Amino acid sequence: TYMYSGMADVAALTGDTAYIHAIDRIWDNIVSKKLYLTGGIGSRASNEGFGANYELPNATAYCETCASIGNVYVNHRLFLFHGDGKYYDVLERSLYNGVLAGISLKGDAFFYPNPLESAGGYERKPWFGCACCPSNLCRFLPSVPGYVYATRDDSLYVNLFMEGTSDLNIGKNK
C-alpha cells in the first residue's frame, strides 16, 4: 500500500495517464476482490501481502495494522486526485476497524496482524521483534486531524465525522 501511495503521488504530479489507469485498476482489484469487510487488507502472513482474488480467510487473515495505515494513505491520495467519496468510504473502514484496532485503549499493546476470528488465544502485545506497527501508529495517529477536511477549488469536504474546528481557505474565502 505504501508503493501504491507513491504511485498515486506520481500520477497526480505528472498527470501520466498510464500511472493513473494503473493505480485505478489496482484500487478496483483491491476493493472488489481483496478487501475485508473491516477494511483490512492482506490475507497472507507469508508475504505480508495479498493472496489470490477472493482469498479472504477469517482465522488466518493477516490484515497487518501497517497495511491499514497504508490503505488510509493511498485512499486519501486517490480522493485528493479524483475527488470521489468512494475513496473515503474505504479509508474510513480501514481507519476505524484496521488502524484503531491495532492499538489498545491504553496505547501500550498492539496487534501486528488483525485476524477476524480467534479461538481466544490472540491478544495485543507490548512489542514485537519487528516493531513497525507501534512506531507507525505513533507517527500516524497525530496526522488523523489532517484527514477530516479537504478543499478543492471552491468546495469543502467534511470526510470524517468527529468533533473539531478548522480554519480553511476555500477558493478566495477563508
List the predicted regions and their residue ranges.
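Glycan-recognition and catalytic cores of secretory/periplasmic carbohydrate-active enzymes
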Residues: 1-174
